[in-house]
Amino acid sequence: SAGMVSTVTLPDSTQVWLNSNSYIKYPTRFVADRDVELVGEAYFKVTRDGRTRFRVHTPAMQVEVMGTEFNVDAYDNPRRTVRTTLVNGSVNLLYSDNEGRGHVIEMMPGQCASFDKTLKSVTVGMADVESVVSWREGKIVLNRTSLADAFRMIENHFNVEFVVRNPMLYEHNFTGVFADQSLETILDHFRYSSHMHFRRTDPRDRASVTGREIIEVY
């Protein structure tokens, strides 16, 4: 449900935090390697096991680890990138390009890897880890955060979809902490700070690839 965070303990004692409208599939016990499937966003605190790898399968790519903490944002939306943020330890990112060639990227703590589903390519950069994982505590933390990233966090938390009609708005950055506040209250912050205008529509009124409520931004 929108705004809800749930926790799951896997058979190997790995802890998983699931963001709103996120789903994880895993066996009742791990026989060989530890494989799970994810749609949505989750934070993993993986129990170290030197004999078996832990793999997170998303519709676009895989993340492979031994024991570490990381965040994966892989909601089922073809227009959005899949993002993996490493908190500590190390992970390997496995994906195939448009020609079917396999690639492996080893990530370092503090890095975020963004996989473009259309181009089948990965961009790696440094992340504001506190902001990325703030959803675990029911918060949205913005620290000079770009509009695109701010809207991404709000979309994940409230199960909505923003359509920005004015590209000039992407020039703004935002700072603030929202805890247990309604979507309308958060939108008011953007209205007053950047003079944005919002139009909320029902997803049945126009085509939405996600089935979410659409919020147009002017």
Language-model regions, residue ranges each:
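A residue-level detector for the "anchor" residue at the start of short, highly conserved motifs
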Residues: 1-218
